[in-house]
Swiss-Prot record:
The lineage of its organism: Viruses, Duplodnaviria, Heunggongvirae, Uroviricota, Caudoviricetes. GO terms for cellular component: virion component. Keywords: Host-virus interaction, Viral attachment to host cell, Virion, Virus entry into host cell. Its main location: virion. GO terms for biological process: symbiont entry into host cell; virion attachment to host cell. It is found in: Virion. This is Head fiber protein. The keyword Cytoplasm does not apply. Gene3D superfamilies: 6.10.140.1630.
């Protein structure tokens, strides 16, 4: 046990929870604030300014006036004017009732030396509100946009995450993600012949198949013949000449032998 002298900061009733106050060269005591962890319990009535001795014992149990009906096993915290009340808030619970009590009666509280600490986003002090909203899982679109600004510095990536990429953004993103020049050319929709060959080799596609020319015995690709205008012949000889020109074009294209 350790004892020291303190002064009552206000009128204090016995069996109420107390807190420590410092004053010039003295220690003062008063009722503990609601929903805080108390430091002492009063065992006698005091008037404001009274000098008293505080005896500190190992924490075991306190007898305190109940603010409300309390059941054995209820977790308790500081109520109004230093009384004790039930609580489910583990951050403010300082013990648990080991006896029944009606409001205004004495209840025995076992002092818990282990406190469960729960930290919420609002407890994080100097933290951006958008980060707190994210941690609470209730971020708005505006919060999300600000978070992306916090997390991402690359403007093209930001544009992608914001769903507003321009063509320049897309090209820059492809340059960020892909190092192979042949694939980049393909993604940029401008591969030259050599690049096309490289890409086919990369995916195991080989050389494109070319249809053979059609013959009388072999099926092949259909070729286009040069355009021919309508014949303007007014006599048989000219008409035959135009027809022979058409036949020649068809032979060249492989339609006929």
């Amino acid at each position: 046990m350790y004892s020291f002298t303190a002064y009552a900061n206000s009128d204090i009733v016995a069996f109420h929870l107390l807190k420590f106050l410092s004053s010039e060269n003295n220690i003062e005591i008063s009722y503990a604030d609601e929903d805080t962890i108390p430091e002492y319990v009063s065992i006698r009535d005091l008037k404001a300014g009274d000098k008293t001795t505080i005896d500190l014992y190992p924490l075991v149990a306190w007898k305190v006036i109940a603010q409300e009906d309390i059941t054995t096993g209820d977790r308790v915290s500081v109520g109004k004017n230093g009384q004790v009340k039930k609580t489910t808030d583990l951050r403010t619970a300082f013990g648990y009732a080991v006896s029944l009590a009606k409001a205004g009666q004495l209840v025995t509280v076992a002092i818990s030396t282990v406190f469960d600490t729960i930290i919420t986003p609002d407890d994080l002090g100097n933290v951006d509100d958008d980060v707190k909203a994210f941690l609470k899982s209730n971020a708005t679109d505006a919060n999300k946009a600000k978070l992306r600004d916090l997390l991402v510095s690359n403007l093209d990536v930001k544009a992608f995450l914001n769903g507003s990429t321009s063509e320049d953004n897309k090209i820059n993103l492809r340059n960020l993600l892909v190092s192979n020049p042949a694939i980049l050319a393909f993604l940029n929709a401008n591969p030259d012949t050599d690049t096309q060959t490289t890409l086919r080799t990369m995916i195991g596609a080989g050389t494109p198949y070319t249809l053979p020319a059609a013959t009388t015995t072999t099926l092949g690709g259909v070729k286009r013949i040069p355009a021919f205008g309508n014949s303007t012949a007014t006599d048989v000889a000219t008409l035959v000449k135009d027809f022979n020109n058409l036949l020649a074009a068809m032979r060249t294209a492989g339609y006929i032998l």
